[in-house]
């Protein structure tokens, strides 16, 4: 195992820290739309202000002249950003310019900047490879939804950004990997080829000390369309599924009676110990964790109310900032759990989820068909949940009674466009198009295995039996048995050894259930194999359905299945 663990949060933090500590004196930090999000996910504003940063600016904003300040730019090397810098250098706003780009900058762009720098105010130009959004230490995203296939409307415009982000992550993690891809996917092969081209073009950047041969495995979301459709029951995944996490921020604006200061909350692993400790806890255990948190807060409240001496008052004042922070943490998580509870109850999600899990884990066809039909016929369930159950059924039983369920959805008033997603999903991720054993017979035993291996109780033993396809892929990597026919190497010279460091990147987006899968794998295999997971986006059900509806795919066999 490499001496230094792969940690995408630490990689970005290291870049930012190096930039701000190496440049002495008061400075203005200038960011673009993307790097503002990248930085905010690993540092708070107050932490950055402590590093002699006087002000934050967006590159697109008109800036006042501050000739006593240094301008420190952390931006993507886009043509738009290069042009903004060149325009500004004609009439400099700062006495010195320190330019840090999140990816490789072309010689043409360097020449443009040099030509524009007539007043000789550019002190340095550097490449610091922080061109991705670090979510968890072992999880990153590029925040690019709508990238399921080459037929997606956004593909042509954003595929270059995907290559940039993945290339940057390799350099940030200091890995020069061999590359494998999903054999049934043009998109993963295309991306593998583009990354290889970049690595060859910039081979000098990959002059790292070698300790084993890392692996970059590029996967396609279509190989597992089930995971993004399922309701989630662990904390981080539930929040994203029901409320949506956007760059560590969650809106509670729709929660009844919510206080103004809680309408948007921040969830940060570095600054919220409760969130960090409960990230992957299941719903059944979260209630106890919240109760413990509230009990701790009440104990502190009682202690603070017992102020009788000057010393007591002094201690209270010294501890007041920590007390305020603790109070905010309690309010935030109680509000989050309250809203999650409300939504689960409102939409009867536990009952829906139980049928979803049965569908995902290969139960008896007649029984599951009847369960799906019962929910479709019952007005207490949402139309969205009814549609998703039929989507899952259509993947699970392609030759089943899909047409009957489509007619049933139509009869209860679900619009034809939404019912059309059933054919779209099968055209995108039908059995003949998928790689890997998504619905293999071993899943029959997943319920028993999950109970025996993890000893889960209560809510989780019913609602978390499903394992993503990624679980089996990681198991194959660990045993050095990942099939070359399914996941070929791009180059002919490949390592036969089990990789110690693995970067898995999924075109079309990842889920927080898969992030949990990677976290669990890493926890069980410390010192043996370490995995980092990245994706074009982090999906929840709504985003996946939106991405699906924007693709121009139809199911060539949409009329089949009727008997």
Curated annotation (Swiss-Prot):
Gene Ontology molecular function terms on file: unfolded protein binding
Q: Does the keyword Protein biosynthesis apply?
A: no
Q: Which UniProt keywords apply?
A: Endosome, Golgi apparatus, Membrane, Protein transport, Transport
Disulfide connectivity for this sequence is none
Membrane protein topology class: Peripheral membrane protein
Q: What does this protein do?
A: May play a role in vesicle-mediated protein trafficking from the Golgi stack through the trans-Golgi network.
Q: Which family, according to UniProt?
A: Belongs to the STXBP/unc-18/SEC1 family.
According to UniProt, the name of this protein is Vacuolar protein sorting-associated protein 45
**Could you tell me which species this protein originates from?**
Dictyostelium discoideum
Whichever gene encodes this chain, its name is vps45
